[in-house]
């Protein structure tokens, strides 16, 4: 079973997400909006399928990264989240919540061995 197949997003804390978005737009040409920027790309094995990677600044006061005390969180794309959760539980990995399903995919949060919160995402188109 494949586990992680790519990076789904980079999330980080900052003092002023609006100013950060504007800076990256002005100086690096990123097409930023209220939630950061979305980078589109095509799947290697099927060029008709598009994938995305999200770049998102969060307020430095966000609770979304808890219980981690880090200033960042990485979202990893996976192929079969339900099966992966079963395996991670068997391996003793800390699973922070129940799998949530939205129109754009399934999500669950885990902790790595250093306490970094990780978001696992199975896109809806998989």
Residue ranges and their predicted role:
Residues 1-15, 34-36, 62-126:
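Vicinal oxygen chelate
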Residues 1-5, 11-56, 90, 108:
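Core segments of cupin and vicinal oxygen chelate
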Residues 3-4, 55, 61, 68, ...:
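General secondary-structure edge motif
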Residues 28-31, 75-77, 97-100:
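Short linear motifs in intrinsically disordered
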Residues 47, 64-66, 100:
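Generic marker of residues within folded, mature protein domains
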Residues 57-62, 124-126:
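A short, sequence-level motif marking secondary-structure junctions
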């Amino acid at each position: 079973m494949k586990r992680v197949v790519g990076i789904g997003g980079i999330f980080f804390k900052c003092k002023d997400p609006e100013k950060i978005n504007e800076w990256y737009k002005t100086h690096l040409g990123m097409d930023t909006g209220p939630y950061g920027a979305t980078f589109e790309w095509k799947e290697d094995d099927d060029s008709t399928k598009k994938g995305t990677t999200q770049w998102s600044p969060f307020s430095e006061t966000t609770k979304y990264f808890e219980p981690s005390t880090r200033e960042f969180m990485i979202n990893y794309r996976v192929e079969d989240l339900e099966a992966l959760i079963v395996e991670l539980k068997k391996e003793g990995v800390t699973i922070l919540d129940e799998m949530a399903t939205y129109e754009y995919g399934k999500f669950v949060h885990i902790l790595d061995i250093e306490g970094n919160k990780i978001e696992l995402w199975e896109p809806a188109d998989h």
